Regions:
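Acidic, surface-exposed loops and disordered segments
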Residues: 1-173
Length: 173
C-alpha cells in the first residue's frame, strides 16, 4: 500500500497517553509538518504555541473545563505536549489554515508513533477573561482566535482501525 495512504488510514484520535516524553527532535519534525500546510494566499498568519509544561497544560485545561462546565478532572486526556493553533480573528481563512496545519501535525505524529487528538472547544471561549488572560501569558496575540489544540503523547494502547463510511463519496457524470 502507498505509505502516505497507509499513514492516513492508520491515524486515529488518541485519548489515553503514557508518561513517555516526546523528544525535541520529533517535536521539531511535527512542527515542520505543520508550518508546511497550505494557507490562504500563502499568508501564513497563524501561530503555533507549544506547551510542554504540565502545570500550564493543566491550568489551561482547568480553565476550559470550568468555562464549559465540564467534569473537574477535564485534562485533555493527559498529553505530554499541546500545540495551540491560532490565527487572526479577521482572517477569513483562519479556520481552514489551522485545520490544514493540524492535519499535517496529526499525520507526522502518527508516522512517528505519537498519538494525537484535536481539542476544538477553545475557539468559542477565547475572549472570556480567564481564558484570554492565560492565552496572553502564553504569548498568543490578542487579535488571535485559537482554532484548535493538538494534544500529543505516546498512546497507552494501539489504535483500533475502524472502517469509514465510503457511501459518502458521490461521482457526478
Amino acid at each position: 500500500m502507498n505509505p502516505v495512504l497507509q499513514n492516513i488510514l492508520t491515524r486515529r484520535s488518541v485519548r489515553a497517553f503514557t508518561d513517555k516524553k516526546i523528544s525535541r527532535e520529533d517535536l521539531n519534525l511535527i512542527l515542520k509538518a505543520g508550518i508546511y500546510a497550505p494557507s490562504g494566499m500563502n499568508k501564513q498568519t497563524w501561530q503555533f504555541t507549544v506547551i510542554q509544561n504540565q502545570n500550564k497544560i493543566q491550568e489551561l485545561a482547568k480553565a476550559i473545563g470550568k468555562s464549559l462546565k465540564r467534569d473537574a478532572n477535564y485534562n485533555f486526556y493527559g498529553p505530554d505536549t499541546i500545540i495551540l493553533l491560532s490565527n487572526e480573528k479577521d482572517n477569513s481563512n483562519g479556520l481552514a489554515d489551522c485545520s490544514s496545519a493540524l492535519q499535517n501535525i496529526f499525520l507526522m505524529a502518527n508516522e512517528l508513533g505519537i498519538g494525537s487528538c484535536w481539542i476544538n472547544q477553545l475557539k468559542t471561549i477565547c475572549d472570556e477573561l480567564e481564558i484570554r488572560s492565560l492565552l496572553n501569558s502564553y504569548g498568543i496575540p490578542e487579535n488571535h482566535i485559537v482554532w484548535g489544540i493538538a494534544v500529543l503523547g505516546y498512546p497507552e494502547k494501539p489504535n483500533e482501525i475502524k472502517p469509514k463510511n465510503e457511501s459518502v463519496i458521490k461521482f457526478v457524470d
